[in-house]
Amino acid sequence: MALTAEQKKEILGQYGLHDTDTGSPEAQVALLTKRIVDLTEHLKQHKHDHHSRRGLLLLVGRRRRLLKYVAQVDVERYRSLIERLGLRR
């Protein structure tokens, strides 16, 4: 269920500012999005797993705060990130 090192490296390569970038908001949002998608799939199978549901809500809140920060700092980076991640239909 947790992200493997290979998955993290692939995501950071796509969304980070450079290969070893782990701190930029884009990289953090991309990693959170992957974790959110994985947890959502888990909860489809295990509907009564309320402990994981709370963790999902915490991750969604953290991603929302990071996206809000990116939108305040640079709207074009925000729009690009949203489009690349497939958020906001």
UniProtKB/Swiss-Prot annotation:
This protein's UniProt keywords: Ribonucleoprotein, Ribosomal protein, RNA-binding, rRNA-binding
GO molecular function, one term: rRNA binding
GO cellular component terms attached to this protein's record: cytosolic small ribosomal subunit
GO BP terms, alphabetized: translation
Pfam families: Ribosomal_S15
Entries under SUPFAM superfamilies matching the protein: S15/NS1 RNA-binding domain
Subunit description: Part of the 30S ribosomal subunit. Forms a bridge to the 50S subunit in the 70S ribosome, contacting the 23S rRNA.
Record HAMAP family: Ribosomal_uS15_B (MF_01343_B)
Cited function: One of the primary rRNA binding proteins, it binds directly to 16S rRNA where it helps nucleate assembly of the platform of the 30S subunit by binding and bridging several RNA helices of the 16S rRNA.
NCBIfam families: S15_bact (TIGR00952)
Family label: Belongs to the universal ribosomal protein uS15 family.
UniProt-recorded name of the protein: Small ribosomal subunit protein uS15
Organism classification: Bacteria, Bacillati, Actinomycetota, Actinomycetes, Mycobacteriales
